[in-house]
Amino acid sequence: MSDEDKRSLKVKAGVVKRLRKELDMYAAEVATETAKVQQLRDAGADPHDIKYQENILAESSAMLPDTRQRLEEAFRELQGLVEELGDGLAGSEELVQAEEQIAAVQPLFA
């Protein structure tokens, strides 16, 4: 139950939390940009404007798989660390936070 173990657990839980937010942000951005592209098409907008919005949509869409992969790697690392250190850190705030992050992200990879 060293301070280094607690710090490592806290950092990895923070990484998972940040990547989850990032994934949610990109998913919301894709939904927003998809709606914008459709709105431009429905309005008969200039093809250049439509193409520009499609490029923005493509960039956001391209970030989803990468972010999901990084989240899965961080999730697996955090899971392994919790299994390794769980008994020694039982009841600690860091362990509780790590377990909360695992529970929040686990449905994505189940």
Label every PLM stretch briefly.
Residues 70-93:
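Long amphipathic alpha-helical coiled-coil segments
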Residues 1-3, 96-110:
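C-terminal helix/juxtamembrane-tail motif
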Residues 49-58, 92, 96:
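Short, charged, amphipathic alpha-helical segments
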Residues 20-23, 61-64, 68, 82, ...:
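A structural signal for well-ordered alpha-helices, especially hydrophobic packing surfaces
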Residues 56-77:
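Amphipathic alpha-helical coiled-coil segments
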Residues 1-14:
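Short, charge-rich amphipathic alpha-helices with coiled-coil/heptad character
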Residues 12, 16-19, 23-40, 60, ...:
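Non-transmembrane amphipathic alpha-helical segments
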